[in-house]
Amino acid sequence: MTNTINKPFNATPAYLEHHIDRGQGSIYVRDYEGSEPAFVLMHGFPDNLHIYDDLIPHLVAGGRRVVAFDFLGFGYSDKQTGARYSYEQQLSDLHAVVEHLGLDKIVPVAHDASGPAGINYAIDYPEHVASVCLLNCAYGVAPTKKTPEIIGLFAHTDLKSYTQALLQSPEQFEWALKFQMSKFLEHMKDDSQIQYLANFLGPIIETNFTKHPTSTPAFVQMTSQLFEEVTRNTKRLPEMEALDIPFKLIWGDHDPYLNTGVAEDFHARLKNSSLHVLPAGHWLQIDIPEQVAAIMLSNE
């Protein structure tokens, strides 16, 4: 199903909506007109496509086609009872978007936990990838990478009885989410960025976990597979290193978890990459969207 949404000038540009059937529900997609290769924007664990709301107008103003979508189980995409979520499913979601929209070559833009989808898509479908853009994301092992506390809690499956009990108490789970956000915010330097991020991102994450049906099953299933996925991706590092596709690494340097050391490790491993470290936190596309867009649109 496809329809057009028009928004006021200076708000989000006009886009087409798509709902792509994945067998256990449909993916929600927004497609903004422009020249190709299209930027295909992907989100991480606790959020959804809205993390790109401030970035997209700059990319569209630069004349480029932009596609943003919610992985199954998150945001506006379906969250069917009994649905199974995995990193392989997210990679397939990306492939389904490319096929449904008839895109030839794309620029996967990966943030946070969508790093595996973006990088593995480049490995598996290099003929469809013009370049790759990585924003404070993870893939395999990296010497300085740290796991956020709430992610580590749910990733340790031997703590399942504890995390299941936590989920039975909305107040305690909300406290855990707010604690994690505070850990990201305390490493940021710019007070205006801190305030804006808290006001912008807080409702996005809250809606993901409080509006029914919620993203909680997808979050729980994805985090429980994290360590196995890191192991699988570490084995694929030689395939990543062999890619001759250009990579842009755009990194907020105030991220205590997926820190600049992670970006430097990517840069050292990749055959064809540029590294851009910016004064921002983990969600740099929210903190400094104009600067991020300028690098994405550049010919470097």
Model-assigned labels for residue ranges:
Residues V60-D70:
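Active-site machinery of serine-nucleophile hydrolases
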Residues D54-H58:
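Typically the conserved alpha-helix immediately C-terminal to a functionally engaged Cys/Sec
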Residues F71, A280:
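Hydrophobic pocket-lining residues within nucleotide cofactor-binding pockets
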Residues G281-A293:
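Catalytic histidine-centered segment of alpha/beta-hydrolase-like enzymes
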Residues E36-H43:
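Short beta-strand element of the alpha/beta-hydrolase
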